Amino acid sequence: MSRKLSREAYTDLFGATEGDRLRLGDTNLLAKIEKDHGTYGDEAVFGGGKTMRDGMGMQSGTTQAEGALDWVFSNAVIIDPILGIQKGDIGVRDGKIAGIGKAGNPDTMDGVDDELVIGPSTDTAPADGLIATPGGLDIHIHFNSKELFEHALASGVTTMFGGGYGGGATTCTTGPENIKRFLQAAEEYPVNVGFYAKGNSSGPDPIIEQIEAGACGLKLHEDWGSTPDVIDTALTVADEEDVQVCIHTDTLNESGFLEDTFEAIDGRTIHTFHIEGAGGGHAPDVLELIGYDHMLPSSTNPSMPYTVNTFDEHLDMVMVCHHLNPDVPEDVAFAESRIRSETIAAEDVLHDMGAISMMTSDSQAMGRMAEVITRTWQTAHKMKSQRGALPADRGTDADNARIKRYVAKYTINPAKVAGINEYVGSLEPGKMADIVLWEPEFYGIKPKYVIKGGFPVHSEMGEANGSLMTCEPVMQRSRMGAVGKAKHAISTTFVSKAAYENDIGDQIGLESRVRPVEGTRDVGKNDMRHNEYAPENIDIDPQTFEVAVDGEHVTCEPAEELPLAKRYSL
């Protein structure tokens, strides 16, 4: 016997379906579901009197060895940079995405996908009405505090690349012994990690020994001297070893100007950190590098989005971060040269155009670990308010093109740049089951569940002595996947191919799986999903700092109010 449900009644029971729109948090962004994989009337739902019972939505007698899922997250709305915006069931086996589609019991339900069979060995975290996104990546982290890992997970970030300590300011771990210690320390946390070595050396041997010790990439920082010779040496070694090079260029233009750095890079792939320049880099024109295919640009979150407070906050942050003395005029001039309202205003617009491809934190060296995802969506909201719908969204009553552009900035694009997109960055089948589940009203700021390697590691959770999980205070807390040996089974440490082939994990006693980065030297701007725009003509006026693209002034007004802010964090 069938029953016809109104669209509203269906949504209350099973969540939104094809053609429905969801508002993301308290932003102005609307996501429209492009496809629903479900079979109406045969939805897999867990609970008393629901369908996920033996012989109904759960196939009797089917073992995990025979193909039953380990986990199913049913009836989720998926927002993914590759898959788009869909509704479906997410199946997990052996810590990986088994598929997205229709899950259930093929004996009793129509349309069940072969790889999404629910059996007695299948567990669930009901995702009805929730939004699922890939675990976020932050590939610009200063590992100065061990609490960063908890803040990352609580915000939806499951992969962390960076370095420590480097004076606390340079995003690199210096020397083979220090790299090994950081790799060992990271075993304590249920995240994917990778550590950058110091690439500032005019000779190759010190760089090579760090790569062989387990570094996943190289970092060039002006505080260690980002000279043309250093840049050339690091890139030469990186090309031989297949690791990425990240660069913080010379703010003071002491060892050369932007043109000299460009010449030293010589067409080779490089990740340009905080490309706007407030975080550091050739003043005032480092932003011009976004116009080249081999330059892979990212922003750091302190300057995103541009608000009425951005300029004043940054000046003090630069002084502290780079050990500058406010009583020394030259130090003050150094800080002031980096903070330019005009280029910060242009940064928002260039993100919205898809010319800046990634968002990162720069945690504890001006940026905030837990705000990568939040500030990405605040920027998307601000740009819709100020620039209107993107051309691809006009006439759709939704913002799908803009949403895909922005979610790619902290998922698939940094995964490609880091050389780990085979493993993370999207919810494509075969990748790690790093999944973040959000209630739509809390999207972008407070995840409901964080799944790492197919197992819950963090979630909203009430008082442990309460009668229910919902007993106040409900707050972000660790789950069982974050403790014991489970955290090793669900996490991955990324190292260079040389270190992987030399069994660095066994050498230093790592229990987490170790995998090599690869393909870092062939990636270009054209590979940046939804963010591949490379302006042919971008100019920064050396006097006014105004930014022009193809002769048109690129700017925006500072925001006085933002979504995903005090309303959620009182």
From Swiss-Prot:
Gene Ontology annotations of biological process type:
urea catabolic process
Q: Where Ni(2+) 1 is bound, by residue?
A: 140, 142, 219, 362
Q: Binding residues for Ni(2+) 2, per the UniProt record?
A: 219, 248, 274
The cross-references to Gene3D superfamilies, in alphabetical order and at most eight, read: Metal-dependent hydrolases (3.20.20.140), Urease, subunit C, domain 1 (2.30.40.10)
Write out the PTM section of this UniProt entry: Carboxylation allows a single lysine to coordinate two nickel ions.
Give the residues the record marks as binding substrate: 221
For the protein in the UniProt heading, the enzyme class is hydrolase
Enumerate the cofactors the protein uses: Ni cation
* SUPFAM superfamilies per the UniProt record, alphabetical: Composite domain of metallo-dependent hydrolases, Metallo-dependent hydrolases
The protein's matches in PANTHER family, at most eight in alphabetical order, are given as:
UREASE (PTHR43440:SF1)
Q: Which family does it belong to?
A: Belongs to the metallo-dependent hydrolases superfamily. Urease alpha subunit family.
Q: How does it assemble?
A: Heterotrimer of UreA (gamma), UreB (beta) and UreC (alpha) subunits. Three heterotrimers associate to form the active enzyme.
Name of the protein this chain belongs to: Urease subunit alpha
